[in-house]
Amino acid sequence: VVVDGITVINPDHYTVFGGGSVGVTIRNLKSFSCKGWSDGIDMMCCHDVLIDNVFMRNSDDCIALYNHRWNWWGGSDNITVQNSILWADIAHPINVGGHGDPESLIGETIENLIFRNIDILEHDEDDVPYQGCMAIDAGDRNRVKNILFEDIRVESIQEGKLFHINIRFNPKYDKQPGQSIDGVTFRNITYNGVGENPSLIKGLDKERMVRNITFENVVVNGEKIKDLKGFITNEYI
């Protein structure tokens, strides 16, 4: 399936929704939304997806990648988002890992995701648990692994944070906690701004930990991140 060169203005819900889809290309898409729940591109249990050269200004998540929801099962893998501009008037520019299969004994995996050469123009979310320009929020028995964020430029955060990496149990959305986050690299990330909340990296407990998070040339207000000073963390990382 190829979606190429369309402009969508004020849809009632998602601009593009993928459920159990394989081999999808979305390119040269422009999306402008202002209604509640009007995410840009949401993918549930999709595989082999390329999102290229899109402009998303949305009144919810610009890009959201999930596992099981509604009638789709089977995990998610091999999704690339590149050469794009994201502007989130509420919620996240990039959000990974929220929905999964709480009834499964082993859960589902979302893996092998690449986000590269992306400009984030704005992030404005007043509800702290849902903040994060680059958010990985593993719930509902999800396992998240092998994620690359590369060459990302963040211009403005009105209300929000830069990074949010969390294994969660949120009763509003989850029936079970997430399982793991393993292998996330942030490379060549820049942000210049003031007033953002501290970034967060947290596991849930000894069985549900965050592992192998790498920062390479991440520069905030001209200073390279060398440690997690200023981050919110816990002992489960």
Question: How would you describe each model-predicted region?
Answer:
Residues V1-I237:
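Extracellular/periplasmic carbohydrate-active domains that bind, remodel
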